[in-house]
């Protein structure tokens, strides 16, 4: 039998209280540190495609973003919920997909369209965070920022800087006009191209160096404001949200950034001569019409392709330098050890791929986005320089950030928390993600395939492993029918609608309740411009066609009425 003996030890009063103090410190200090919620710096970048160093672009000079990628997680298969500013940002900041929110275009005002939705920054405020915001976060400028979103909002949303929107008006730039800034005179448009996006009031499809102080550019002003808040923050935890305007057009930047990319060194995207030949009718329209930017043929005609590529990369490098300034300030304020950094772009941007400029398409150049999550430097349990290949979506931001902060997630949010991936605990991850580029039109992206399904029932299918530039549409191959049908299972039902119909150049939506809506399909994404009242004869014929034929398919084209 084991014998247990009592041992008595005499301890001096000084030693006793010293040991007691050590016990109190050892018990309480780590717990107190663990109880301090982390800060989050939330960085959005407008119109940034995957032309960054950490995603493999050979010319992009982005040392600060690359350094962030080396300290955290870079998601190499991240896609946007919508390839246009308004619906993508609405999805991120509401946690709701375009199909759920009904926001498919840039005609968005939260107070009018989503008055009951608690936005992501407001959710953090409601859960004990001090929330600061500056720059382009919500679409539509400072007037569209919900009052409850931030404790303090600094404004500064305006992509025209250093010029004003008035100075970029089409009527003033036909063919050009002179603007004086900082004692210097500029001839606009800088690229010498005429505006061919006629419906837009401002001629922003322009680029080139602007030799003015950084302080005249809104992104520089936004970063300076954000850094100033770090000086004044009295309470943690905080969420600091910073929205950059560049590389949104016009691609105007301080001259030194353009000097980084000589025109004779510009590497242009590969655009085969007959690249559009295997596309459906709707896709060709989407490629060629200058909805969000100008025409490819205009860029080529005026010899501006190299200049545009150089200016886009200059914009990216300008933003990168500003990000570096913010990170340096976090380090100087000794906040870096308890601050997560989340960096994302609202969607991609074409620079001639598919003969298209701008965004708003279903191709990967519009849907793929840079996305970084960088844990605090003091948290060693997370890996560094981890390239994550799982399919993820910007809708995943809201639940992920809630998990990072240790606050409740809204049951209405539709994304998936990425915390299991960050902790290497993700099992059975669904490797497919959805991008919606208009009512009834969607892209499904997987590691191997990208399916683009249009409202009229036409499709594109690309093998992203063997054809990453999407040169060969495989949708018409009979052996791919099963794959297409399998991918279409990820497309939402959109139960509000009975039919999506294309007739000539009209897009027709037939709801289960209410009146038929008719749109000019060339401007398909502008779903606020219903012209049904202007074409009553067409509406009558469509109703007659449906009554007579009782279509079984939800999406189809009518050739003759």
Residues of each region from the PLM?
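Formylglycine-dependent sulfatase
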Residues: 2, 10, 27-454, 458-459, ...
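Bacterial N-terminal signal peptides
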Residues: 12-23
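Terminal low-complexity segments of carbohydrate-biosynthetic enzymes
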Residues: 316, 520-521
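Short beta-strand micro-motifs enriched in acidic
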Residues: 452-454, 509-513
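Short hydrophobic beta-strand that contains or immediately precedes a catalytic carboxylate
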Residues: 461-462, 518-519
